[in-house]
Amino acid sequence: MNKGKYIFLDVDGVLNHHETYKKKHVNSLYPDLDPECLALFSKLVHSIDYVHIVLSSSWRLIESDMDRLEAAFKEFGIPKWIDITPYLEYEQGKTRGKEINQWLKENHVRKDQIIILDDNTDMADLKDRLIQTDFMNGGFKEVHLKKALHMLKGNHMTKETKEIFEALEAANNTLDNLYKAL
């Protein structure tokens, strides 16, 4: 299972955000997921050959959440995840990063083959593979898509590149806040 690229996907803060719950897409089977975030995620998945999704979200623990997510994926043409990360108990020092590391070890996947889409930072030694989204600021956005594509295509994340993406994200957040103020 070690060929290709892998996206470790959190749901809350990536495929939804605080505005999603205000809007509650009433005509949808998945009112707690944002259609714009799903469309961008679909674009990401279809832009990379041999990409696999591994669900690292707490949604993996609740069957009804996984059913809703699967329905949304189907509607947006996103392939179903190939696996879920193991659940570590708190006594084992549970963090999302440790769960992902455990999955990598069990499946013989290298760190340079992955990205992590998450709004949390508890990634242990995987922080350089994290594309951090923001639950309070729109979830998965175009800037995250561009950064994910950059990393999944094997491009090295230099200090300058990192600064460019940070500046783009800050500018994007400023624009979003200006639009909200109108």
Predicted segments with their positions:
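Short His-Asn-centered micro-motif
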Residues: 9, 56-62, 117-119
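Short, basic/hydrophobic alpha-helical segments
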Residues: 38-49, 102-110
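Active-site neighborhood of HAD-like aspartate-dependent phosphohydrolases
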Residues: 2-47
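Short coil/turn segments at beta-strand junctions that form active-site/ligand-binding loops
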Residues: 3-5, 49-51, 111-113
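Substrate-recognition element of Asp-dependent hydrolases with the DxDx(T/V) motif
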Residues: 48-67
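C-terminal cap/substrate-recognition subdomain and adjoining C-terminal extension
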Residues: 67-165
